[in-house]
Amino acid sequence: MLDKVKNVIVVLSGKGGVGKSTVSTQLALALRATGHKVGLLDIDLCGPSVPYLLGLEGSDIYQCEDGWVPIYTDESKTLAVMSIGFLLKNRNDPVIWRGPKKTMMIRQFLTDVKWEDMDYLIIDTPPGTSDEHITVMECMREVPCNGAIIVTTPQGVALDDVRKEITFCKKTGIKLLGIVENMSGFVCPHCTECTNIFSSNGGAELARLAQVPHLGTLPIDPRVGVLSGSTASVLNELPDSSTAQIMRNIVQHLDALTAVPTPAQV
């Protein structure tokens, strides 16, 4: 039930291992840190990592008359989370489903979860372009989806897959809100200097060629990795980091696109 959700943002990646779920999670936390009410929906059925990233493993969801009730991270109920990970008894249990069953589960997540007055719903999708993505796009035709953010790394093999993702978005009619280049450079935990140990600026160049906004370049920062397993936002814990600055910029970009006022500045 998305009738109480003002804005829907889909987070995509051309391939796995680019940090899409981490970006989705920190974006949701950054939006909450700036005063928004946020929902985070993890539809990566075969590799749900959002419960782990937020330290919510072992949480139980239940159903009410209006549908599934998401997990709230605290009593303020400003961040609601739903993932198939909450339905698995063991984190190591594989989800061995054929396409139709996956499609049915995703439709349930998009239509039967009781989201309450959310400014934003962030949807963390599986990597690639598959049945799951087509299902999401079909369901998004029934609700106001603002568009998609694509996460990539600067390596050529990842960028090749992102080109396919861009084509997929165009063919399915979803607006591209921008590209985030992740894992670009390494931040020394001692001096905080960033060194480009791999290639860099591939995401920025791809955004230029695709004529979509380049939302920022995120480095590998061990300090950000330490926040995994908690609901701590980089905006609060590492306010001077480059990751925090990029997340602020993305929040401001989304607020400008959606005309949602920012209740608080962090």
UniProtKB/Swiss-Prot annotation:
Residues that coordinate or bind [4Fe-4S] cluster: 188, 191
Q: Per UniProt, what is one GO molecular function of this protein?
A: metal ion binding
GO CC term, one of those recorded? cytosol
For this protein, the record's InterPro entries field holds:
Mrp-like_CS, Mrp/NBP35_ATP-bd, NUBP2/Cfd1_eukaryotes, P-loop_NTPase, YlxH/NBP35
Residues where ATP binds? 14-21
Q: Return the CDD domains for the record.
A: Mrp_NBP35
Keyword line = 4Fe-4S, ATP-binding, Cytoplasm, Iron, Iron-sulfur, Metal-binding, Nucleotide-binding
**GO biological process assignments:** iron-sulfur cluster assembly
What detail does the entry give on cofactor binding? Answer: Binds 4 [4Fe-4S] clusters per heterotetramer. Contains two stable clusters in the N-termini of Nubp1 and two labile, bridging clusters between subunits of the Nubp1-Nubp2 heterotetramer.
As cofactor, the record names: [4Fe-4S] cluster
Where is the protein situated, by its record's location annotation?
Cytoplasm
Where's it mainly located?
Answer: cytoplasm
Keyword Phosphoprotein annotated: no
Q: Which domain of life is it from?
A: Eukaryota
Q: What is the stated purpose of this protein?
A: Component of the cytosolic iron-sulfur (Fe/S) protein assembly (CIA) machinery. Required for maturation of extramitochondrial Fe-S proteins. The Nubp1-Nubp2 heterotetramer forms a Fe-S scaffold complex, mediating the de novo assembly of an Fe-S cluster and its transfer to target apoproteins.
- Recorded family membership: Belongs to the Mrp/NBP35 ATP-binding proteins family. Nubp2/CFD1 subfamily.
Please give the subunit comment from the record: Heterotetramer of 2 Nubp1 and 2 Nubp2 chains.
The molecule here is called Cytosolic Fe-S cluster assembly factor Nubp2 homolog
Q: Which organism is it from?
A: Drosophila virilis (Fruit fly)
Name of the gene encoding the protein in the UniProt record:
Nubp2
